[in-house]
């Protein structure tokens, strides 16, 4: 046993739990089990600034307890550790070990500090988003709404699949570049035609991969931000989609690809698609020339990750800024005025902080708009290009695509971590994120950039059913990738972008998604609740969500054998709720690869109790 005792997840030692709003203080306590103590202090460091020590005062009634306050005035990423000075002896230090616990050392260089996230503000999210169940659609691969399946706006030098059962593939040239793009012919009218299906499934909002004019099937190579891609339909089709969604109390967010454009776009126009003498690659006097950084004109230029099909745009250029988010005539203003309910920003870590804030300011001129960013890591400590990103500060993104949570689900269900570590990993993310930011993250089990969840879980339908249960019970907004509920398999791109198997769906998985979508709408704790963990003998994991007067418990047996609910351990769960759970579930026997969901009738949960 060490001589310094601390647990950041217990209110006995740290109040409040988790992230802190700037301008507030953290009450911090440690217990010190050693003699000749001359000083106890907590050292706090903001990124790239000097450490400030705050003395802790010995408690009059409990001599081993030392308490003080950390004063936080500005938002940012902070780290802290404890120092105990002793008479005629080396100082002791306590840094982070795992979970909320610390590790003691006499060597300051070996201290791994605890993280403290501080944010400026939390803005209440729109009510529709709070209640949302999202569905992500890759438009070319979902549905064709034309009467006889005819394909609109066929592009030159492309190929069309003979049937929607064909597996997607890329055709490369001798330089391993895409020689011609492949299409199935899905369109906006197809999405409109399938709205009844989506509504029956329990979907209340759509996230569409890019729909603007482009050369590729994924359309992340935008050619014209102000036009719908002709293969997907017309602007009138888009307006009809928005109208039909809103009439059905459903909402829509679009994919904003503002870091780069297509090489053949009207802005760059390397292939003369928009005329021989227009665009930055053909005319140095073009109004778009200053948008790009040419190293050797016109063939060498900055592009996204070295992909010359995707010239990078200079986000600091005033003309480009006004084009994207200006108040009048901008890309955002046009589509927001047509009824878009929010945006998902592609490669958000490539967009400067000020650029993100101005996008947010544009959206804030409208009621109930949402802004989500593509960030693959823990957004509270994300660093890109040597700069820590203030995603969680409250003035740019509402939330991010929660890839860390996806990885958590996969590691749990593939048995890559024991249940104690799984619980600690989840609560670490909960601790690091401001509460609203955590609840606003768009959770997924797969996207167009990942392998399909059925493939990742080795074609195990029972495990995918558990994954869906977790998706709808974890903090955040659930988002189903098109076809996952139908049992679509798929490895890496392009295999993860197969056409939806209409008429050949997995009814068991569809029923599972429908069930959990209904449960989420009924349970307030799943939308607003705190998050706790229960471990039963390292056999069963319990995911607990609770508010002041309601709670739910999801029990998960990930093993291919029966499991007993016994030897309960809790993490970040109020004592009164622990007692209610023990009475309800102790002794239960769970079948292999199953879940059990319970609503707990607790009159009042004291969320500020210790655990």
Task: Label each residue range with its predicted role.
Residues 1-130, 204:
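Glycan-association/targeting regions that enable binding to alpha-glucans and other polysaccharides
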Residues 27, 534-571:
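Carbohydrate-binding surface patches
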Residues 30, 137, 198, 208, ...:
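Conserved, mostly hydrophobic/aromatic
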Residues 32-34, 79, 133, 584-611:
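C-terminal beta-strand-rich structural cap/linker in extracellular carbohydrate-active enzymes
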Residues 133-135, 206-208, 252-254, 343, ...:
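Hydrophobic faces of well-ordered beta-strands that scaffold small-molecule active sites
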Residues 138-204, 211-338, 359-365, 381-382, ...:
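Substrate-binding/active-site clefts of carbohydrate-active enzymes
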Residues 242-251, 260, 265-276, 331-333, ...:
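Active-site-proximal helices and loops of the catalytic beta/alpha 8
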Residues 427-526, 563:
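Active-site-proximal substrate-binding groove within the catalytic cores of carbohydrate-active enzymes
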